[in-house]
Amino acid sequence: MTRDVRQLFGTDGVRGRANFEPMTVETSVLLGKAVAGVLLEKHAGKHRVVVGKDTRLSGYMFENALIAGLTSMGIETLMLGPIPTPGVAFITRAYRADAGIMISASHNPYRDNGIKIFSSDGFKIGQAVEERIEAMVASKDFGKLPDDHAVGKNKRVKDATGRYIEYAKATFPKGRTLKGLRIVLDCAHGATYRVAPSVFEELDAEVICYGCEPSGCNINAGCGALWPSTIQKAVIEHKADVGIALDGDGDRLIMVDEKGHIVDGDMLLSICASDLKRRQALSDNRVVATVMTNFGVLRYLESLGIQVTISPVGDRHVLQHMLENQAVLGGEQSGHMIFLDYNTTGDGIVSALQVLRIMIESESTLSDLTACIAKSPQALINVPVTKKVPLESLANVQGVLKEVKEVLGDSGRILLRYSGTENICRVMVEGTKKHQVDSLAKTIVDVVEAEIGAEISE
């Protein structure tokens, strides 16, 4: 059956439930062929593609399927095994590969999986390339197949994680260590379960690990960046200096201070932006944030003389606005933070190292660094939905939004949007009084659930 353009790719690559379209072995083989076809359209000859994955059970079958499609077209593949998404971006550049592929559904449950594709420069491919890949998959016209002696070889790269560990450590100042710091680390049973403990331990920190025993079916399950309550308790229990929570593919970071308080992506962005400005390393005194960024955080950044460019939600949009505005730092509340001086995509480990460096150099605790940032009261609730009906077509939803806006007046704001990667509607309400914000958000949630709500599946 012929697919319409953009039926495969979403806001962050291809994603869906494993063994359901588009995340099937059959479609993955076609995607591998299509990636090869796009490379061969640029120029004939030898090409190589690196392939990494997180710890999902379904990663094995998608790894084999993609490699089969690529090698059938004459492409050499380099199999990295479990490695964070930013590790794939780095290895793609380091090995001078023509493309990189990460098999992951990021922060989604284990039953989902996805495919992210990087170009040779380590940036995620753009929409035009995605559309060309989709067109090839739909037509199954990948160009001439190679002769039997010219099919591609697949090689396992044994030192890929070691290279990434050394790269990550190199972003920390030479001569400095993490000696004396006790860190609670939650790797979400995901792609960082080996590399993250190694990075922090080799820099001489005392590391207490959680979420470092992947089973293939426990990635992001009540742990990691989406569930920081795990390390909140652990930081207090172990009298740790800081908690670090990464998501399943290692491109998000949420931290916890020594008092057990969550420090989200907005706060981390503020800390790092302030440091870069102080060191005169913040290009054009500008950072990129998103429409979800807390208004109090925006006020704080502006009080420092930092210009803030606002992008839609999603690390792809953040990166696009960074490149357009020549910004070196961008991030979002969920914990994606991009340091273009270090990597071409969000990197949770590298981001954590920058925050730890700031703590050490300023002789401050994490709570000291956040004390001057007054966040506005905000409620953010995720509502599982059966389908993504255009919100403007739902009269009852529009009605409650109007009512809530009238209550908030000019002292608050509402944001209602669908997730680009899950069947979820995000309800965000911001204002001046926490109890009012929570109540108004619940009012909106009740209406959204009544209109399009879905039962939560286990």
UniProtKB/Swiss-Prot annotation:
Its cofactor is Mg(2+). The modification Phosphoserine is found at S106. It comes from the Bacteria. The keyword Disulfide bond does not apply. It catalyses: alpha-D-glucosamine 1-phosphate = D-glucosamine 6-phosphate. GO terms for biological process: carbohydrate metabolic process; peptidoglycan biosynthetic process; UDP-N-acetylglucosamine biosynthetic process. GO terms for cellular component: cytosol. Keywords: Isomerase, Magnesium, Metal-binding, Phosphoprotein. GO terms for molecular function: magnesium ion binding; phosphoglucosamine mutase activity; phosphomannomutase activity. HAMAP family: GlmM_B. Belongs to the phosphohexose mutase family. This is Phosphoglucosamine mutase. It comes from Chlamydia trachomatis serovar A (strain ATCC VR-571B / DSM 19440 / HAR-13). The gene is glmM.
